[in-house]
Amino acid sequence: LIDAAHQRGLMVFLDVVYNHFGPEGNYLPRIAPQFFTDAHTPWGGAINYENENVRAFAIDNALHWLDHYRFDGLRLDAVHAIVTPGEPEILQALSQAVGDLAKRTGRHIHLVLENDDNRAAVLDPHEEPPAGHYRAQWNDDYHHAWHVLMTGEDAGYYRDYQDAPARIVRSLREGFAWQGEPSSNRKGKARGEQSGHLPPTAFV
């Protein structure tokens, strides 16, 4: 399937989930409890990326998809839900490993984040190959603002987009609609970083 897409000039990305294992039918805690911490997520126990073997598990999985199946890129689901102290080092380590693969094979490999924290510092669409950064972020701000404008729904995280037209304009001009302002959905906690210096290609 991927070869057929490539023959037609199409890239193929795979959506991968490294922020949690399934909450039901997941027996990994019984056989490998070191994979988890005492922290909890909406999807079960938090993954213990401070453990070297656990980090290697995720990185090797990413490389497997990219090297053996020749996917052109990965979209990392909800990385803001990775529960580790400070900046999740797994993100940088994974990007560096993928960058090494891209350099070794001469391929263009793309890494895209879903990150509700709007972390501009981890994005660098110009780095070739990517080694420590990510080419782009799934920009939910733009979608959420349009959703509120078109449907009127403003509950939950949509609460932050009640001024939808202004958020749409800011997303088009600067990328993120939230760049460090207090978020009502997060009970006044600041959300996001300045993103106006990034090109449009950094936002999907």
Give, region by region, the residue ranges found by the protein language model:
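Substrate-binding/active-site clefts of carbohydrate-active enzymes
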Residues: L1-R70, R75-R104, A121-V122
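Conserved alpha/beta catalytic core and glycan-binding cleft of carbohydrate-active enzymes
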Residues: L91, S95-V204
